């Protein structure tokens, strides 16, 4: 046991109370790193008198990181040049109904191939996915479900506009995107493997008349992400379009340039 804290509170029936607890400072903790993924565990126990009513375990890790525009990424003071892979949460024969064993197998294979970063393409993944990244030492780019699929045809097509063309659909769509971002951060925030929250993937695959509201939604989700978790940067994934004054790569802290994005002169090459 590294540290413990106990708080008591008398509550009336059916009352709700939030406990705010802080342990003493932990001296020289082992730092989480892909090469040595040290993890700790918080055990939260709820008692009624001497009777244990509930118990919940939360794994977490200590690490610090820094993203820089000119020197790249640093983890615990060490410069890392990412060797990353896009990984979807699906399997042949299973589709999206992937077992946790299947997820762990995929992550182990990526690790054994020499990679150190996974981009969770292109939606929130299962907590088991993040947990496995923690346990085996895999950095994780966690992404929200706001993405274009290669075009901007009308509703009902596989490559429909990333942002709704019909104004009557927009409020519900935006609420859904923001709700999923909130859930993503609340569910996965304690995972040390996660070093960035991504707002999107290629949302520029949208109808021309929706470019402005698409950009506005990105700005709002970036702001929301920072409110919910100021410790991690907010990224715009798949930000290689559009060019000019409508570009989206500068709306967040970090931008991902997919496909030909690294060859477009307007974009700075990675550090």
Label every PLM stretch briefly:
Residues 107-110, 117-271:
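Substrate-binding/catalytic cleft of secreted carbohydrate-active enzymes
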Residues 1-132, 136-140, 180, 195-196, ...:
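Secreted/periplasmic carbohydrate-active enzymes, especially glycoside hydrolases
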């Amino acid at each position: 046991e590294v540290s413990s804290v106990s708080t008591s509170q008398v509550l009336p029936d059916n009352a709700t109370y939030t406990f705010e607890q802080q342990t003493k400072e932990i001296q020289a903790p082992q730092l989480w790193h892909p090469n040595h993924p040290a993890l700790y565990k918080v055990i939260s126990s709820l008692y009624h008198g001497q009777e244990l009513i509930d118990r919940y375990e939360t794994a977490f890790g200590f690490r610090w990181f820094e993203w820089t525009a000119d020197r790249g990424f640093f983890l615990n003071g060490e410069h890392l040049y990412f060797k990353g892979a896009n990984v979807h949460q699906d399997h042949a024969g299973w589709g999206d109904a992937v077992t946790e064993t299947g997820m762990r197998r995929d992550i182990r294979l990526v690790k054994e191939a020499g990679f150190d970063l996974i981009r969770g393409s292109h939606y929130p993944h299962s907590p088991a996915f993040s947990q496995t990244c923690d346990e085996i030492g895999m950095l994780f780019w966690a992404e929200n479900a706001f993405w274009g699929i290669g075009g901007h045809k009308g509703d009902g097509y596989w490559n429909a506009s990333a942002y709704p063309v019909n104004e009557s659909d927009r409020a519900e769509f935006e609420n859904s995107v923001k709700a999923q971002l909130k859930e993503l951060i609340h569910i996965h925030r304690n995972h040390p493997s996660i070093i960035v929250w991504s707002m999107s993937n290629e949302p520029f695959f949208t109808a021309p008349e929706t470019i402005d509201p698409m950009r506005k939604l990105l700005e709002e989700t970036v702001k929301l992400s920072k409110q919910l978790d100021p410790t991690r940067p907010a990224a715009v994934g798949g930000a290689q379009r559009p060019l000019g004054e409508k570009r989206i790569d500068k709306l967040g802290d970090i931008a991902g340039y997919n496909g030909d994005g690294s060859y477009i002169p307007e974009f700075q090459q990675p550090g």
